[in-house]
């Protein structure tokens, strides 16, 4: 019997979800898909500079799982940058902060609208 799936936690959905090389029509590009969890792993480790153990704890996953996710994300980003591919950030099964675990396409996973003051 396989182990139960552990829901991954992210702080927010990335504000920009698509990148492509300038000057090349989208129809001529190959595309790499980066999951939302992989983008969060990159953010925690490479942007915020957290240690893998800290980042894994924040995402509610084991350190080896975090490491595999980070390597996968780095490979996809490097492939897109060096080989002129588009990069789409979407998909995955995760929870945003304390919201229930779900897929990005469901309404409960969308970011809260800004509060008006």
From Swiss-Prot:
A UniProt-annotated Pfam family: DUF134
SUPFAM superfamilies, per the entry: Sigma3 and sigma4 domains of RNA polymerase sigma factors
Disulfide bonds: none
InterPro entries cross-referenced by the UniProt entry: RNA_pol_sigma_r3/r4-like, UPF0251, WH-like_DNA-bd_sf
Family of the protein in this entry: Belongs to the UPF0251 family.
Protein name per its UniProtKB record: UPF0251 protein DehaBAV1_0135
């Amino acid at each position: 019997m396989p182990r139960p799936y552990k829901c991954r936690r992210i702080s927010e959905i990335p504000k920009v979800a698509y990148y492509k090389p300038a000057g090349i029509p989208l129809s001529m590009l190959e595309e790499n898909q980066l999951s939302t969890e992989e983008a969060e792993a990159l953010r925690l480790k490479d942007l915020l500079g957290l240690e893998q153990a800290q980042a894994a704890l924040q995402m509610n996953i084991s350190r080896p799982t975090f490491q595999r996710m980070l390597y996968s994300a780095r490979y996809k980003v490097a492939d897109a940058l060096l080989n002129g591919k588009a990069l789409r950030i979407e998909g995955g099964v995760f929870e945003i902060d304390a919201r229930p675990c779900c897929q990005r396409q469901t309404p409960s996973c969308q970011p809260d609208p800004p509060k008006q003051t």
